[in-house]
From Swiss-Prot:
Protein name in UniProt: BLOC-1-related complex subunit 5
Localisation per UniProt entry: Lysosome membrane
Membrane topology term: Lipid-anchor
UniProt modification remark: Myristoylation at Gly-2 mediates attachment to lysosome membranes.
Species the sequence originates in: Bos taurus (Bovine)
Function description: As part of the BORC complex may play a role in lysosomes movement and localization at the cell periphery. Associated with the cytosolic face of lysosomes, the BORC complex may recruit ARL8B and couple lysosomes to microtubule plus-end-directed kinesin motor. Thereby, it may indirectly play a role in cell spreading and motility.
Summary of subunit composition and partner proteins: Component of the BLOC-one-related complex (BORC) which is composed of BLOC1S1, BLOC1S2, BORCS5, BORCS6, BORCS7, BORCS8, KXD1 and SNAPIN. Interacts with ARL8B, KIF5A, KLC1 and PLEKHM2; links the lysosomal BORC complex to the microtubule plus-end-directed kinesin motor.
UniProt keyword Lipoprotein, yes or no: yes
């Protein structure tokens, strides 16, 4: 903006304002006028050792696909553009289509085999699950019967304890009776074991 005003002032030399000298504030500051408070620590940077610059230099140059349409150009240059042959592009597309069709058939075949195998596995798992369920029910019945056996064993132990406490009392009572009224010695063991 300042340069435009100065050029306008030069183009109108007969103007009344042209004789006015610019104020000292509009003068550019000289290096002598600048006071440096603290010198900054700005090391001299060597661009050739910068890793980013080295990586950018390692990128290979390449030409655009359609020569003549470089960035910034709106219309192609007078150089003859290379054109693609439509028949070859069509053959390329047809080959690619055939390749995709073959890949799709292979995937569909594998998918069908996988679905069939999954159905077989589902059937096997269902059969195994029903078998295990029946076995679990059977074992639950066995566990219930074992629980009954344990209960009966506890009852028999209590009966045995009662007999063990009662037999000495019976023997004592029997010893207090007269000789003619005494009973035979009481025994829980069967007669077979007594005879042996």
């Amino acid at each position: 903006m300042g340069s435009e005003q100065s050029s306008e002032a030069e183009s109108r030399p007969n103007d009344l304002n042209s004789s006015v000298t610019p104020s000292p504030a509009k003068h550019r500051a000289k290096m002598d006028d600048i006071v440096v408070v603290a010198q900054g620590s700005q090391a001299s940077r060597n661009v050739s050792n910068d890793p980013d610059v080295i990586k950018l230099q390692e990128i290979p140059t390449f030409q655009p696909l359609l020569k003549g349409l470089l960035s910034g150009q709106t219309s192609p240059t007078n150089a003859k553009l290379e054109k693609l042959d439509s028949q070859q592009v069509l053959q390329l597309c047809l080959r690619y289509q055939d390749h995709l069709h073959q890949c799709a058939e292979a995937v569909a075949f594998d998918q069908n085999a996988l679905v069939k195998r999954i159905k077989e596995m589902d059937l096997s798992v269902e059969t195994l699950f029903s078998f295990m369920q029946e076995r679990q029910k059977r074992y639950a019945k066995y566990a219930e019967q074992i629980q009954k056996v344990n209960e009966m064993s506890a009852i028999l132990r209590r009966i045995q304890m009662g007999i063990d406490q009662t037999v000495p009392l019976l023997e004592r009572l029997n010893s207090l009776l007269p000789e003619a009224e005494r009973l035979e010695p009481f025994s829980v063991k069967p007669d077979r074991e007594l005879r042996l």
